[in-house]
């Protein structure tokens, strides 16, 4: 049930559940179809929201959250 902290190396062949935080995903350079330099990263609020929605079902969610199942919607047109 562990997870990888931000900016640490992750496995590009595994899903984003390996990265801690609801909005963190395994970001890789794609070099001729080969993933390399993969690190747990966060994008902007829009990216974070879609990543979070996918990560709601991670079996190891307890590693970074107390099982809360909510994602913060991105601010659209400055209305938050």
UniProtKB/Swiss-Prot annotation:
It comes from the Eukaryota. The presence of a 'disulfide through disulfide knot' structurally defines this protein as a knottin. Omega-agatoxin are antagonists of voltage-gated calcium channels (Cav). Induces rapid general flaccid paralysis followed by death when injected into the cerebral ventricle of mice at dose levels of 3 ug per mouse. The keyword Manganese does not apply. Expressed by the venom gland. Signal peptide: none annotated. The keyword RNA-binding does not apply. GO terms for molecular function: calcium channel regulator activity; toxin activity. Pfam families: Toxin_34. It is found in: Secreted. InterPro entries: Omega-agatoxin_II/III_CS (IPR005853), Toxin_34 (IPR013605). Its main location: secreted. Disulfide bonds join 3-20, 10-26, 17-52, 19-40, 28-38, 58-71, 75-80. GO terms for cellular component: extracellular region. Belongs to the neurotoxin 04 (omega-agtx) family. 03 (type II/III omega-agtx) subfamily. Keywords: Calcium channel impairing toxin, Disulfide bond, Ion channel impairing toxin, Knottin, Neurotoxin, Secreted, Toxin, Voltage-gated calcium channel impairing toxin. The lineage of its organism: Eukaryota, Metazoa, Ecdysozoa, Arthropoda, Chelicerata. This is U20-ctenitoxin-Pn1a.
């Amino acid at each position: 049930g562990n997870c990888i902290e931000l900016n640490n190396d992750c496995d590009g062949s595994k899903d984003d559940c390996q990265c801690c935080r609801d909005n963190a995903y395994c970001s890789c350079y794609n070099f001729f179809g080969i993933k390399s330099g993969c690190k747990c990263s966060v994008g902007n609020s829009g990216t974070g929201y879609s990543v979070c929605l996918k990560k709601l079902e991670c079996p190891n969610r307890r590693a970074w959250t107390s099982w809360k199942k909510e994602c913060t919607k991105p601010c659209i047109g400055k209305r938050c």
